[in-house]
């Protein structure tokens, strides 16, 4: 039941449904974004795990290379050991290539998913904006409905007042006709007097209304002409003062009218008490009580309406502030989501760059392994010495032949160096040396193989990834040195053998 004449009001506000729909969609969007962020975090964890696995594989390869560097002893069986290590490295390289293909496929799928999520995010923005427009439309409709409700309530109050007035007049007329015929002329005179006073009051009200309308129009014209802040404050203060004066005048007039009515009622009661033939005092008392009850009810209803009006104004202000706060929070949340998306995008870019670096490093490792294979093939040098011993320790002939095949950056070349020595004298010979060098994946390789005619021997030297290898071989003595120098450690290995 409403407060206006006991008539039920069943009006449903459109703002609740629109707000519920908007809140539900925002909550669904947040849940969907949380799930998508969780999936992206899982994928990022998988990528980090794969990168750590590749780092571990790289560490294993580095350890194997270090073992190969430290385990060089110059024996003839080193080739099998290198071949096994090369096969293991080939398997690991193939595994890395397969992982690379898989990672590239994952990156492609992730880019597609990122594009899909971006489209979904843009669609969500469009939906939110459309709902915001619907919300404004619903607010406009709500304002219109509330204005209509206020208009209908005012009309209802006017009708109720008319009904009460008509009932009072009808009851009074019936009582006057049935009970007091002798006071008809007095009542008619009083009625005419009251009517005349009402007409006078109406005329005064019309005059005041006309004056106020003209003043308001003049003030509006003045306001439109000059709208500075000081004039607005002055107009507001004057308006508040005028409203206070009007309220004070209204209260004074209401008090005077109430006193006049009470005086008239008292006079009427005294007149009724003076009449000896009157026997309906109880009816008048009941009527007076009903009038007082109606008056108190009207006052209480007016107080309730004023309190409800104040509550509605406060509620409207709170809703406006709440809407502004929610809009600000929503914009801040969208900015945070955009920043998170940019961070994920940067992380994906960094992962792609790391993958490219790993692929480049893998290519460098393959090139280094190929270089090791070339050096191992070059280490298989066939050297043989044929001696024919005569009388008195006479060395009749010595022949040393060296065949070397060198592959550098995909280019193969060969040479043969040999000489013939008789009786300790050099009768003829040919000496040739070659220097090969290059850089593969940050590892420098270089070597020198030649024969010195003055020392009657073969000198072999090289540099592989910071490992220096050198040696000299002749008919009586073989010596060599292997040294490795790096950024973090240094190591060397020397061997020597004599053949008497």
From Swiss-Prot:
The keyword Glycoprotein does not apply. GO terms for molecular function: structural constituent of cytoskeleton. Residues 82-219 are annotated as: Coil 1B. It holds the Pfam family Filament. Residues 1-36 are annotated as: Head. Residues 238-383 are annotated as: Coil 2. InterPro entries: IF_rod_dom. This is Intermediate filament protein ifc-1. It comes from Caenorhabditis elegans.
């Amino acid at each position: 039941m409403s407060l206006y004449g006991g008539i039920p009001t069943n009006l449903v506000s459109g703002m609740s449904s629109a707000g519920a729909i908007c809140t539900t969609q925002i909550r669904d969007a947040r849940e969907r974004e949380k799930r998508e962020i969780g999936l992206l975090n899982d994928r990022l964890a998988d990528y980090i795990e794969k990168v750590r696995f590749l780092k571990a594989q790289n560490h294993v390869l580095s350890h194997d290379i270090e073992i190969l560097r430290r385990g060089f002893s110059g024996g003839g069986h080193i080739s099998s050991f290198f071949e096994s290590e090369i096969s293991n490295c080939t398997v690991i390289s193939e595994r890395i290539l397969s992982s690379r293909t898989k990672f590239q496929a994952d990156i492609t799928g992730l880019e597609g998913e990122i594009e899909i999520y971006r489209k979904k995010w843009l669609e969500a923005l469009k939906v939110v904006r459309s709902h915001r427009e619907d919300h404004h439309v619903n607010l406009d409709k709500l304002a219109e409905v509330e204005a209509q409700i206020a208009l209908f309530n005012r009309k209802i109050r006017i009708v109720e007042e008319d009904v009460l007035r008509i009932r009072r007049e009808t009851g009074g007329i019936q009582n006057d006709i049935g009970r007091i015929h002798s006071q008809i002329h007095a009542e008619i005179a009083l009625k005419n007097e009251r009517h005349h006073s009402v007409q006078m009051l109406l005329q005064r009200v019309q005059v005041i209304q006309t004056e106020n309308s003209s003043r308001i129009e003049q003030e509006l014209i003045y306001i439109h002409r000059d709208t500075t802040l000081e004039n607005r404050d002055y107009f507001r203060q004057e308006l508040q003062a005028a409203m206070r004066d009007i309220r004070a005048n209204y209260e004074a007039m209401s008090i005077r009218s109430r006193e006049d009515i009470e005086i008239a009622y008292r006079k009427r009661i005294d007149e009724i008490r003076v009449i000896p033939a009157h026997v309906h005092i109880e009816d008048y008392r009941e009527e007076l009580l009903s009038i007082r009850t109606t008056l108190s009810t009207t006052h209480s209803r007016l107080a309730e309406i004023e309190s409800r009006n104040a509550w509605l104004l406060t509620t409207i202000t709170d809703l406006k502030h709440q809407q502004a706060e929610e809009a600000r929070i929503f914009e801040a949340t969208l900015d945070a989501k955009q920043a998170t998306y940019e961070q994920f995008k940067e992380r994906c870019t960094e992962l792609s760059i790391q993958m490219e670096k790993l692929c480049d490093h893998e290519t460098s490792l393959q090139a280094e392994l190929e270089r090791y294979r070339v050096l191992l093939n070059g280490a298989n040098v066939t050297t043989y010495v044929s001696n024919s011993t005569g009388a008195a320790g006479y060395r009749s002939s010595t022949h040393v032949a060296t065949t070397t095949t060198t592959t550098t950056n995909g280019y193969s070349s060969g040479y043969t160096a040999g000489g013939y020595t008789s009786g300790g004298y050099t009768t003829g010979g040919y000496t040739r040396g070659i220097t090969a060098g290059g850089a593969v994946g940050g590892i420098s390789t270089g070597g020198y193989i030649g024969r010195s005619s003055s020392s009657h021997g073969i000198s072999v030297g090289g540099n592989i990834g910071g490992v220096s290898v050198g040696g000299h071989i002749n008919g009586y003595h073989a010596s060599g040195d292997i040294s490795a120098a790096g950024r973090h450690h240094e190591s060397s290995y020397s061997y020597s053998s004599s053949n008497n």
